[in-house]
């Protein structure tokens, strides 16, 4: 009897484990050889919204201002080394905000 009760719980436990596994997997965006986490793009938006660098710093650098922020996520730092950093960040933002470009679900098959 105890064995039947335990086997009846297995499907429920399996579903819970799958949900936990799915929620711990990171979603990545790949573009022009760069691989960044979706979560990093959300942090980038937050950094840009709350940080205004000095006009002197902006004038001295060809890089996007956020490249000078000390809290820039590590996976975004290589983008700053690129000569096309501004356009790459712009494209990554577009991809991150477009559900049809980004599978937000592990089982995603794309938009119709």
From Swiss-Prot:
The entry's keywords: Disulfide bond, Secreted, Signal
Keyword Disulfide bond attributed: yes
Cystine crosslinks: 67-80, 100-108, 103-111
Keyword Secreted among record annotations: yes
Location of this chain's protein in the cell: Secreted
Entry's Gene Ontology cellular component terms: extracellular exosome; extracellular region
Stored Pfam families: Guanylin
Signal peptide, first to last residue: 1-26
Propiece residues: 27-88
Record-level Gene Ontology MF annotations: guanylate cyclase activator activity
A GO biological-process term: body fluid secretion
Tissue: Stomach and intestine.
Function according to Swiss-Prot or TrEMBL: Endogenous activator of intestinal guanylate cyclase. It stimulates this enzyme through the same receptor binding region as the heat-stable enterotoxins. May be a potent physiological regulator of intestinal fluid and electrolyte transport. May be an autocrine/paracrine regulator of intestinal salt and water transport.
Family under the similarity heading: Belongs to the guanylin family.
Protein name per Swiss-Prot or TrEMBL: Guanylate cyclase activator 2B
Species, as recorded: Homo sapiens (Human)
This protein's encoding gene: GUCA2B
